[in-house]
């Protein structure tokens, strides 16, 4: 049976100034603080809790590897842990515009990830039993993500 995608939620997160870590065996590492934000979807909505971060690195082939970890607080006060690992890459000229904080159409670059959730027992524990993918758009001070459940 062929799987389909079902919209889970749309998330907007405000980002802090990247903290350069430097060269590592993986590539050029930086930490991007996640300051907060909001999310909404057909089955859940709430806020992005400040305090998370994206421990990303840029490989030699100029692919950015995203390794984000953060919390979501639902409208009914349940905390959901998110781990999101993905890739962002595109033509050099497009990446330079993104780095400069310019507005770039997300269709000009590839930004995909595979989020996973850790939810407590209760109304959202179904998140622990599904696989998800997401697509994203990077902006100067924020990120916009669309999460999909693989059916």
Whereabouts are the PLM-identified features?
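Beta-strand-enriched cores of mature, soluble protein domains
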Residues: 1-151
């Amino acid at each position: 049976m062929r799987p389909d995608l079902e919209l889970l939620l749309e998330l907007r997160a405000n980002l802090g100034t990247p903290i350069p870590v430097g060269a590592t065996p993986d590539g050029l590492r930086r930490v991007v603080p996640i300051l907060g934000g909001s999310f909404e979807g057909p089955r859940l909505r709430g806020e992005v809790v400040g305090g998370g971060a994206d421990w990303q690195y840029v490989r030699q082939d100029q692919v950015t590897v995203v390794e984000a970890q953060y919390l979501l607080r639902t409208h009914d006060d349940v905390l959901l842990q998110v781990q999101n690992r993905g890739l962002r890459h595109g033509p050099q000229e497009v990446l330079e515009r993104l780095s400069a904080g310019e507005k770039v159409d997300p269709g000009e670059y590839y930004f995909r990830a595979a989020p996973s959730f850790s939810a407590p027992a209760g109304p959202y524990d179904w998140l622990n039993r599904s696989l998800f993918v997401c697509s994203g758009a990077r902006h100067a001070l924020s990120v916009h993500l669309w999460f999909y459940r693989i059916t």
